Amino acid sequence: MISELCTFALATGATRVVLRHEGGPGGRIEAPNWHSGGFLIVNASGRLFRVPLASPALEEIPTGSVSGLNNDHGPSPDGRTLAISAKSETGGSCIYLMPVEGGEPVRVTPRTPSWWHGWSPDGARLAYAAARGGGPVGVTTCAVDGSDERPLAPGFDHADGPDYAPDGAWIWFNGERDGSADLWRVRPDGTDLERMTEGETVDWFPHPSPDGRHVLFLAYPPGTRGHPADLPVALRLMPQDGGGSREVLRLRGGQGTSNVPCWAPDGGAFAFVRYPA
């Protein structure tokens, strides 16, 4: 399986292939974050890697006693801490925090399953997808110490991918309701729920840009169930204050392409992964 770790510049429309990986050590590359220190963070075969933009190569980030990471991870707003998601001692996914350079993770969420997706702009809270009490997966937040867990936006068949707007005023997510899979946003206190897309495509993983202008999201073909890999998909942009979206890239991908926040710190570019056939 070939993985191409790429960046896309909004001003020029240029795609740069940062790293072309043909399997081997690390396996399939997935879910890039763009760190302010000039490197990307990716998952490959349940391990985390740093990829310096100036001299691209996979450099493993040690995760101590925690293994089998999934592709839901991301650095804190100050760039010092990394949120990761991995199987707990009891088997369900939970969220851990660790130094961005690597180290022994500290478990945050006492309950499982929990899959991290976003930091609040002040670094005080985490947004994640969680299933509780046998119910469907939904949008949830908690304090960084795992306390004050708050489920948001009930009433969806499935809700996932929550990510904060840069001013902290909204949490964007993808939600399935009444047979439609669209993007939504809600206030951090659970009020003012608002549908932001409505169309034939199956929309996943909204990521508001740090400059407050855009939301990047992944659009699957109509009728797609879940967020599978290796399909013809599109990356689309829409304004953060609402309105129509536009396609910026068409590629082979899906799962692993843009699961987590992937914007450059200035909002002028984003990272993604594609999987050429």
Model-derived segments and their meaning:
Residues 7-28, 53-68, 98-113, 142-160, ...:
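Multi-bladed beta-propeller domains
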Residues 179, 200-237:
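Loop/turn-rich, solvent-exposed surfaces of beta-rich toroidal or solenoidal domains
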